[in-house]
Every structure is written in structure tokens, then in C-alpha cells.
Amino acid sequence: YLARDREGMSPRTFHCTWSSPALGEVGGRTLIFFGGPDGWVYAFEALKKAPPEGTVETLKLAWKFDCDPAGPKQDIHSYLRNRKESPSNIKSMPVLHEGRLYVTAGGDVWWGKRQSWLKCIDPTGSGDVTTTHEVWSYPMPSHCCTTPAIVDGLAFVADCAGTVHCVDIKTGKACWTHQVRGE
């Protein structure tokens, strides 16, 4: 191990960890952004250098953001196969773009509710920024596993019902949606 966290994600993990971490610089700090298995986005301060061999460092939490504050946080496994109410998780990689962080989160594809969001977060805070740093939230009626793709002021994500969403990154409003054909 090069590093570890002390945020206690394991007991709040509804299914498993899906998200790849992302690295970016915000306000002169190099941060590691991680979409947690518990529906929280975590920003950790990156290590400045590798620790001495045999040493395991603890990453320092810069901030965290709950993508589903209304979702259950206790006894989460009792919601297994509950398609209406369940904890959320994050399957996508957070994307830092022009001073904002974008991530999709929502119910687990196999075991959870059929609801998700594309979130835009101001990544400059500290501590729990859930109530203070959400720029906007775009709801989707189905699960979402895709990492946002951002170009020319637009975010593109596809949900698990086969709908591609194009969202204006300034307003969080849909520009268009398109139902793709598939099996």
C-alpha cells in the first residue's frame, strides 16, 4: 500500500467500489477525487512523495460530498433488491473541468433504486460540503454508470435505460436527450 483512507467507507458499501480515482489541482492543492461506494465523493490531499518502504500513509481528507443525502445510511443491506428506495453508489470517475467537478451517482444497477444524478460540485471547500458546494444537480430516471464527457460547455452521459443526456454545464439543464436503440 502507498496510502489508505480513514473515512470508514466499508460499512456503508452497498455493493462494491466501482469508481476510478481522478487527480487534479484546485486552489494550489493537488487532490485525489474518489467516487465512493457509499455515494459520497471524497477529495483527498495527494501525497507529495512516496512514503518510506514498509510505511502506509493515511490520506488527509480535504472535503466530502454526499450525492444522495436523502438515501439510507444505516442498515444498508436491508435494501437489497429494493428498486424504489436504497442507498446510492458511484460507478463513474469524477471529472475536474474548468474549476468544477462532475460525477454521476445513484442507485446500484443490480440491487438498488432506479434513479441517478449528474452532479456539478464546487471543489474548493473543506470538510462536509454537501449543503454548501453543489452547483447543480441533473436528475435521471434510471441508473447511470458513465463517466461524464465534457466538451464545448456540454456534459454527455448515458443512463442504463439507453438514454443519452446532453447537459449545459453552466446551468445543469438538459439541452437534449436521445433514446438509443439496443437489445
Positions of predicted regions on the chain:
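Noncatalytic, solvent-exposed loop/strand surfaces
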Residues: 1-183
